[in-house]
């Protein structure tokens, strides 16, 4: 009898495991959104790093679903959903953004709606570009993470450092910001939080001189390929591990 119950439990667990869908939310600004290559004759960047990352992850696990309120990418991209918002700062991801005639909500709307299992977060570039109380940007980032954890306590958060620009002064500010964010992530990890560091700035090795940018800020198609490689290396190990956790959540 006990053996029968045990086998039944395994069967039911395996059934849930097979049905589990892992929801991934790319979250950030225009670098996550993509599509800012304006030079004639250059490959499009529509879909950003997602154009290369999505099919590679789907080849590992077909039960992945990219989620978000926005949709962008080339026709060949099977899943185009994301939360990349052009010009947005850290604080705006929390509170939303007021436009001349409209208001767009932030994570307090998106996260409960899409309930992601994995969040790919890259944000902070616009805080520096807009010179928006830069010294307080790391504190705003901590508040953002606190809110994400409150709204989606089961989610795994992968945090990418901000990438360089073609301006040395801005890069110095970006490096300082990245360093403080990294320290925060390490502190969170020591407390058992499901939060991980992706050193995009150094691992992607992107440079204006190498043709990795379409302008002073946004990656070119080549730059996005490098970003996709880094994301893939960090996300792939979580895909299968998250499957079981998602099945238990159902």
Language model feature labels by segment:
Residues 18-20:
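Boundary at the C-terminal end of the N-terminal hydrophobic targeting segment
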Residues 81-86, 163-245:
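Catalytic His-Asp segment of secreted/periplasmic serine-dependent ester chemistry enzymes
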Residues 32, 36, 54, 58-59, ...:
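Sec-exported extracytoplasmic/periplasmic mature domains
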């Amino acid at each position: 009898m006990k053996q029968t119950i045990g086998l039944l439990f395994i069967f039911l667990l395996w059934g849930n495991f097979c049905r589990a869908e892992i929801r991934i939310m790319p979250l950030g600004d225009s670098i996550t959104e993509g599509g800012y290559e304006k030079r004639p004759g250059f490959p499009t960047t529509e879909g950003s790093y997602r154009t290369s990352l999505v099919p590679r992850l789907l080849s590992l696990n077909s039960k992945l679903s990219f989620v978000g309120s926005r949709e962008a990418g080339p026709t060949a991209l099977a899943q185009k959903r994301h939360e990349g918002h052009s010009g947005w700062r850290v604080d705006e991801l929390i509170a939303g953004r007021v436009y001349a005639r409209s208001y767009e909500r932030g994570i307090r709307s998106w996260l409960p709606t899409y309930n992601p299992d994995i969040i790919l977060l890259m944000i902070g570039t616009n805080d520096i570009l807009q010179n928006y109380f830069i010294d307080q940007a790391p504190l705003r980032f901590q508040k953002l993470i606190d809110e994400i954890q409150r709204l989606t306590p089961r989610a795994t958060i992968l945090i990418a450092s901000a990438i360089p620009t073609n301006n040395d002064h801005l890069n110095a500010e970006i490096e300082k910001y990245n360093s403080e964010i990294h320290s925060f992530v390490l502190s969170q990890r020591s407390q058992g939080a499901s939060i991980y560091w992706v050193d995009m700035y150094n691992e992607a090795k992107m440079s204006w001189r190498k043709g990795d940018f379409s302008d002073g800020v946004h990656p070119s198609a080549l730059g996005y390929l490098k970003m996709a490689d880094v994301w893939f290396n960090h996300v792939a190990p979580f895909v299968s591990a998250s499957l079981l956790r998602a099945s238990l959540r159902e």
